[in-house]
Design a protein with these regions (language model features):
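Small-residue (G/A/S/T)-rich helix-start motifs and N-terminal tracts that mark the onset
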Residues: 1-132, 139-153, 158, 162-286
Length: 286
């Protein structure tokens, strides 16, 4: 697995004491105060990625979660997470109302790189909202012609990072700090370079490292859960860099807790663990 375990200059290690916290909620709080997250993803055959991301966002505290996906995935979404507002979406025109309502957009889980995914992502890119791009949104970004609004986050693994930078995966791995900084500078976003020893870089030069996690986390769907978590923290008012750092730490520590059972960890196992850790770190009530 990718490694960033050795000491790095000018890098802050993520610990409970260095992480930002969500503010406690007023007894009179309502859902509109905690953001409306729109998730765009789930092309044919990849609905599970979108559902994992949507459930993660909901369970991490977003006030409302909408899902724009292929219409054949809507029944599964309603059955698994009825609290998520799932809309069968055939074209970018159907996104326009949702884009206006959303406060945060997450794009990429199960999106695919065919015409459907490209058109939806192009529409999202034009919305002046903080965004989280993962998976195929990053592969489409690497092809050019798209940019992200300010206050956004990208979450590539080393292969995606290599495509975004136009270099080899080996070159990314040879100097991960330089790679994540280059990503942040090139796209003017907060960049998360995933892997053992995940790194988070911001355009203003900050760099943080997470040394938590477990090898049982080497399984599909973990990135979808992370993307939903980052989006939920953004929706609740944390700045992009703080959201990314807190999300990476919560995700890794949840993986440690669930990884104690060994092989067979499923991405969905992390969601209740993340919820518990978030409550311990940022209590809902004072």
């Amino acid at each position: 697995m990718p490694q960033t375990k050795h000491p790095l200059p000018d890098t802050q290690l993520l610990t409970p004491g260095t992480l930002s916290r969500l503010t406690a909620r007023s007894p009179s709080a309502h859902k509109g105060q905690f953001g409306h997250l729109l998730l765009i993803g789930g092309d044919r055959g990849f609905g599970g990625a979108a559902l994992l991301c949507a459930e993660s966002a909901l369970r991490s505290g977003a006030g409302m979660v909408s899902l724009a996906t292929r219409r054949e995935h809507v029944p599964a979404a309603l059955a698994r997470v009825p609290e998520v507002m799932a809309l069968g979406t055939d074209s970018a025109n159907q996104l326009m109302g949702l884009l206006e309502q959303a406060s945060v957009i997450v794009a990429g889980p199960g999106l695919g790189q065919a015409a459907w995914g490209r058109s939806l992502l192009s529409a999202a890119a034009n919305a002046p909202r903080p965004q989280v791009w993962d998976a195929d949104a990053l592969n489409l970004l690497a092809k050019g012609g798209l940019s992200l609004p300010s206050g956004s986050v990208i979450t590539p693994h080393p292969g995606e990072a290599a495509r975004l930078l136009g270099i080899s995966t080996a070159q990314v791995q040879a100097d991960r700090p330089a790679a994540v900084r280059a990503l942040s500078k090139k796209y003017t976003v907060v960049a998360v370079l995933k892997g053992a020893g995940s790194l988070i870089a911001s355009p203003d030069g900050r760099l943080s490292r997470c040394d938590r996690g477990h090898p049982a986390m080497a399984t599909a769907g973990l990135g979808d859960v992370l993307a939903g978590l980052v989006g939920a923290l953004l929706a609740q008012g944390l700045p992009a860099f703080d959201s990314a750092c807190l999300a990476v730490w919560l995700h890794a520590v949840a993986g440690e807790h669930q990884g104690k059972l060994g092989r067979g960890l499923a991405a969905s196992d992390l969601i209740p663990a993340i919820r518990q850790l978030l409550e311990e770190q940022s209590p809902c009530l004072k």
